[in-house]
Amino acid sequence: MDVSKVTTSDGGGDSMETKPSPQPQPAAILSSNAPPPFLSKTYDMVDDHNTDSIVSWSANNNSFIVWKPPEFARDLLPKNFKHNNFSSFVRQLNTYGFRKVDPDRWEFANEGFLRGQKHLLQSITRRKPAHGQGQGHQRSQHSNGQNSSVSACVEVGKFGLEEEVERLKRDKNVLMQELVRLRQQQQSTDNQLQTMVQRLQGMENRQQQLMSFLAKAVQSPHFLSQFLQQQNQQNESNRRISDTSKKRRFKRDGIVRNNDSATPDGQIVKYQPPMHEQAKAMFKQLMKMEPYKTGDDGFLLGNGTSTTEGTEMETSSNQVSGITLKEMPTASEIQSSSPIETTPENVSAASEATENCIPSPDDLTLPDFTHMLPENNSEKPPESFMEPNLGGSSPLLDPDLLIDDSLSFDIDDFPMDSDIDPVDYGLLERLLMSSPVPDNMDSTPVDNETEQEQNGWDKTKHMDNLTQQMGLLSPETLDLSRQNP
């Protein structure tokens, strides 16, 4: 025990007092040397071999590793720290200066936290913020910011960083897609804008051209007349096109037209009636003549002398028959003509008059009428078309056939060919006004011969004119026959 002496003076003398010194308290010494409870509990928890699967020392024994954070927070924290928040445990480690060693796992280390050296825990102190003014206050704020950033890094760890990186990647992909879409939209908008600008430029050019044309047209004095003329021409062309586009319907006249004669579209071809139509036109003219006598051969002849002379000129009459009546129209066409009377004397007179003036059938080109004959009449002999009569006036054909309506035809509907010369109606009138053959046949032979030559030449001339009109006898052949009477 230590004794301290204290000297006091009372006026003239000193006095000595002895007082005992105070003894140190053991509890205060222990409390000053003991580590913080958080560090002690953490050390005991890590050093426990029963929990090595959850938390244990590292291989270097200078740090500890939390292998299973969920089980650590669920089982160990409530037993030692009365809470189950792993983030709070990490923040508490940060206040005592622990750092995260490996970013991929929860490994923490401190210089005073080593395996087997628990006494070093006393060197670990808790970090406190400074309360000074000025620079001290700024240093405290800076240290607090560093502590918060370090604590944030410690709290995030491996899994937090991976999640953050994945989230940032997703955001980046979304932003890139949006950027690509906006660029495509901008490109399409630029293309549309360029197209619109080109259209506007073309419209402006057309307007300028239109205005310049109108200015020149107004200054031109013939503009209005030319414009009206072009309009009329266009209307006329449209009308012609509409007229030509209409289908033309032909009248049904009973004439069979071959397919070969069909004209191509858009061509104008002159209509040329076939030869049988011309023959029908000739028989229409002959129908208007007065009836004549018929000879033994049934030919159409004028006044004659006797049947004896007619039979003597049989060869000549056959030649005439070969020219004029060898290829006759069909029976239906002949039946429409009126009966003609003749006498045997007409045969000789006509034969002598036409023997030298009409050439042989070989020198002539005659139309073919055989295609007009029906099948039932083509096998009959030519004599069936005529009926000889030696007794005077008898019709050329049977009058009863003319009554049959089935054999009649309308001749007025057949058009005439424009290439044929017009009919000499004056000649037909003279033929109609001539007197028929007299019943008295007792005239002198000289008068009969003279009358026969005159009548025969006249009738031959008339027949030549009609034949020339039909186109059966060419003008060259007719001139040759007239030079050799």
Curated annotation (Swiss-Prot):
Pfam families named among the record's database cross-references: HSF_DNA-bind
Residue numbers spanned by region Disordered: 1-34, 126-149, 229-269, 436-461
Gene Ontology terms, MF aspect: DNA-binding transcription factor activity; sequence-specific DNA binding
Compositionally biased residues, Low complexity: 136-146
Subcellular compartments: Cytoplasm; Nucleus
One GO cellular component term noted in the UniProt record for this chain: nucleus
GO terms under biological process: response to heat
Motif position, Bipartite nuclear localization signal: 238-252
SMART domains: HSF
Domain of life: Eukaryota
Chain location of the short sequence motif Nuclear export signal per the record: 472-480
Post-translational events: Exhibits temperature-dependent phosphorylation.
Ranges of the DNA-binding region feature: 35-129
Ranges of Polar residues composition bias in the record: 441-455
Region (Hydrophobic repeat HR-A/B): 152-218
Keywords linked to the UniProt accession: Cytoplasm, DNA-binding, Nucleus, Phosphoprotein, Stress response, Transcription, Transcription regulation
Recorded domain comment: The hydrophobic-rich region (HR-A/B) corresponds to the oligomerization domain.
Family membership noted in the UniProt record: Belongs to the HSF family. Class A subfamily.
Role according to the record: Transcriptional regulator that specifically binds DNA sequence 5'-AGAAnnTTCT-3' known as heat shock promoter elements (HSE).
Assembly information from the UniProt record: Homotrimer. Interacts with HSP90-2.
Protein name: Heat stress transcription factor A-1d
Gene: HSFA1D
